Swiss-Prot record:
Name of the protein: Guanylate kinase
Top class in the EC scheme: transferase
GO cellular component: cytosol
Source organism: Symbiobacterium thermophilum (strain DSM 24528 / JCM 14929 / IAM 14863 / T)
Enzyme Commission number(s) from the entry: 2.7.4.8
Length: 211
């Protein structure tokens, strides 16, 4: 029998506070069969965050130990804090044929896309810079200087979105979630349609002949 096909690796990124995490969580809540890779970080928890749900919150020393041990699929330092994607979980789940979503920053997304060219890349953008400013300010965790810095960097982020497979404008959560779901369904259908290699393998093994 042919090997079980690997699951999709879906990379979702976008400017800070664009709402990519909210989109991913909403999709996971109503779409069975998709797994979420929880990243590790050294940044402090924000109000309402739970260890192991939004992130695994670990010390800088522990993070650096895991870097040295090669335990991260990708990692980056962003605004003075480390962020990284555990390698073992992603490789294990996709090998089992399950789809995995990564909600990561653009530096990490770039690293994953280089390692996994077949990954499905999705870039989330705000409907306007004013909407992004309001979302950053609404967090209540950023200083005015930090808000200004993130807004100044946003155009560069958005230009990078030109290299992604798909772009979602997050002006309505339900619509954004529906678009992400449609992207995943289309990609899964595409992998099924591109089944020539499987047929060739079965023919070579004689599974589709009368011999």
């Amino acid at each position: 029998m042919p090997n079980k096909p690997k699951g999709l690796l879906i990379v979702v990124t976008g400017p800070s506070a664009v709402g990519k995490g909210t989109i991913c969580r909403a999709l996971l809540a109503e779409t069975p069969g998709i797994r979420f890779s929880v990243s590790c970080t050294t940044r402090p928890k924000r109000p309402g965050e739970v260890d192991g749900v939004e992130y695994y919150f670990i010390s800088k020393e522990e993070f650096e130990r895991r870097i040295a041990a090669g335990e991260f699929l990708e990692w980056a330092e962003v605004y003075g804090n480390y962020y990284g994607t555990p390698r073992g979980y992603v490789e294990e789940v996709t090998a089992q044929g399950q789809d995995v979503i990564l909600d990561i920053d653009r530096v990490g997304a770039r690293a994953v896309r280089e390692q996994y060219p077949d990954a499905v890349s999705v870039f989330v953008i705000p409907p306007s810079m004013e909407a992004l400013r309001q979302r950053i300010a609404a967090r209540g965790t950023e200083s005015p200087e930090a808000v200004a810095r993130r807004l100044a960097e946003a155009p560069e982020w958005i230009r990078e979105g030109l290299t992604y497979d798909y772009v979602i404008v997050n002006d309505d959560l339900a619509r954004a979630v529906a678009e992400l779901r449609a992207i995943i369904m289309a990609e899964k259908a595409r992998t099924v349609r591109n089944g020539a290699a499987l047929i060739e393998t079965l023919l070579e093994k004689g599974a589709l002949t009368d011999e």
